[in-house]
């Protein structure tokens, strides 16, 4: 999340989107122990830092606990991965608005390739979809049910089956930076988005 895209750290794009969103009051950035100790992101961007844990679930729980303690009246939250820098303020606002009618919102993608299964010889791709950040939740419901020791790696999977889900299939230019070459792809996508405005 600290590599550079168009002369800005990748994490800057998420920070900028959250800062410009109209439907949220505040946001936090979860970082590892070394980044927390240095406080660099706070100095550079003026953001509130929360120290993460040894696992993704521990880090997420630390964030939830911070929100619960410092924002006791929090109704809704949205999380993003800094490795997904294409997020926009408008998307954040749309996800938060959807929480008026749903318990949580997932960024979803249809599977277009063939799908295999370790358990069954045949897997019907129509039964599955991909999930990526961002995702949004009604905070009290998520806080009540989230367990940092769970083997489930996506927060929504810990919610009760009665929780209502909105699958957001319209975030077409989301892209997660995983490998160095992905940066070139994101820069191309950002350029195209700017040209289409």
Residue ranges and their predicted role:
Residues 1-33:
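N-terminal glycine-rich phosphate-binding loop and ensuing alpha1 helix
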Residues 3, 85, 121, 135, ...:
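Residues that recognize and position ribonucleotide moieties
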Residues 34-40:
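Short, charged/polar "capping" segments at the starts of alpha-helices
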Residues 49-51, 125-129:
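Short pre-catalytic strand/loop immediately N-terminal to key active-site residues, enriched for Gly-Thr
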Residues 55-118, 132:
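Conserved beta-loop-beta/alpha segment of the NTase-like Rossmann-fold superfamily
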Residues 130-197:
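Conserved alpha/beta core of the MobA/IspD/sugar-nucleotide pyrophosphorylase nucleotidyltransferase superfamily
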């Amino acid at each position: 999340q600290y590599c550079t895209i168009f002369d800005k750290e990748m994490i800057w794009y998420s920070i900028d989107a959250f800062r410009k969103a109209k439907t949220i009051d505040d946001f936090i950035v979860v970082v590892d122990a070394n980044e927390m100790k240095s406080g660099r992101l706070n100095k550079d961007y003026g953001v509130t830092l929360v120290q993460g844990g040894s696992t993704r679930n521990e880090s997420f729980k630390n964030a939830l606990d911070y929100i619960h303690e410092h924002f006791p009246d929090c109704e809704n939250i949205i999380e993003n991965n800094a490795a997904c820098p294409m997020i926009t303020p408008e998307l954040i606002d749309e996800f938060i608005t959807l929480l008026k009618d749903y318990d949580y919102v997932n960024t979803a993608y249809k599977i277009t390739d063939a799908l295999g299964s370790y358990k069954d010889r045949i897997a019907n791709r129509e039964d599955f979809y991909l999930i990526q950040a961002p995702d949004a939740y009604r905070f009290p419901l998520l806080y009540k049910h989230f367990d940092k020791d769970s083997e489930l790696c996506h927060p929504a999977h810990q919610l009760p089956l009665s929780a209502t889900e909105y699958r957001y299939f319209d975030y077409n230019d989301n892209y997660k930076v995983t490998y160095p070459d992905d940066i070139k792809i994101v820069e191309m996508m950002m350029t195209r988005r700017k040209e289409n405005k």
